[in-house]
Curated annotation (Swiss-Prot):
Coiled coil: none
Record's function text: The phosphoenolpyruvate-dependent sugar phosphotransferase system (PTS), a major carbohydrate active -transport system, catalyzes the phosphorylation of incoming sugar substrates concomitant with their translocation across the cell membrane. This system is involved in fructose transport.
Organism: Bacillus subtilis (strain 168)
UniProt xrefs under PANTHER family: N-ACETYLGALACTOSAMINE PERMEASE II COMPONENT-RELATED (PTHR32502), PTS SYSTEM MANNOSE-SPECIFIC EIIC COMPONENT (PTHR32502:SF4)
InterPro entries referenced in this protein's UniProt entry, alphabetically: GatZ_KbaZ_carbometab (IPR050303), PTS_IIC_man (IPR004700)
Protein name: Fructose permease IIC component
Signal peptide from the UniProt entry: none
Key words, A-Z: Cell membrane, Membrane, Phosphotransferase system, Sugar transport, Transmembrane, Transmembrane helix, Transport
Gene responsible for this protein: levF
Free-text comment about domains: The EIIC domain forms the PTS system translocation channel and contains the specific substrate-binding site.
Chief site of localization: membrane
Compartments (UniProt record): Cell membrane
Gene Ontology terms: biological process: phosphoenolpyruvate-dependent sugar phosphotransferase system
Amino acid sequence: MSSLQIILLLIIAAITGIASVLDEGQTHRPLVACTLVGLVLGDLKTGIILGGTLELMALGWMNVGLAMAPDTAIASVISTILVITADQGIGEGIAVAVALAAAGQALTIFVRTITVFFIHRADQYAKAGNIKGIEIMHITAMVFQALRVMIPTLIVALISVSAVQAFLGNIPDVITKGLQIGGGIIVVVGYAMVINMMNIPYLKPFFYIGFLLAAFTDFNLVGFGALGLCLALLYQQVMQKQSAHGAVAAASDSGSVAVYDDDDDDLDA
């Protein structure tokens, strides 16, 4: 791995670490982070495949109250580096990502506990009207979030390929298979949570059509994407026509009422 690749990986790690807190650019999501890492390491295809697989798993990962979700940023960046540099399969990448996400969860809690100090300092600066101090506290807290992903990434990037291959090769098959099965279960849970959140009756037929086509046809992802786009455009056009027809009908009804009122006024006069 060249020095330029290591620098680019550290930049990606910093961006994903900060984005995992800001939740605006969504660059910490596996589909984005793994793709960027794959692009830097020269294996974009593996990055996209691993990112898409991990994204399905991460659909069910979210913070609920004080319960911290697994760390998608560390899992995405480091698992992609290990899979590509050690020439491993997607199954091994999923197994490594699940373990890294659990370890990153503890690291996230540790870093967020440290940033509480900066929050209290920012409150003090706010009372004193020190805007510059508040900005410094925000930036410092984000630096800690960036280092949370950058330091493990640097350690993994500096490890030799042979050492990584030896480490992954020594993992027992029972652990690897177990984590792969667990990852598959997490995918199903993530899908169920998304469908539950999108519990809109008039959209359910589209879900059923998609599942039936996936089960009984040989469509690939490109075909499903094109079909979904066509159905979305068709649905939008139908809804627009119905809305326009309803607006015309409402306008005609209101016009007839207005004429009737004018006649009443004439009679009263």
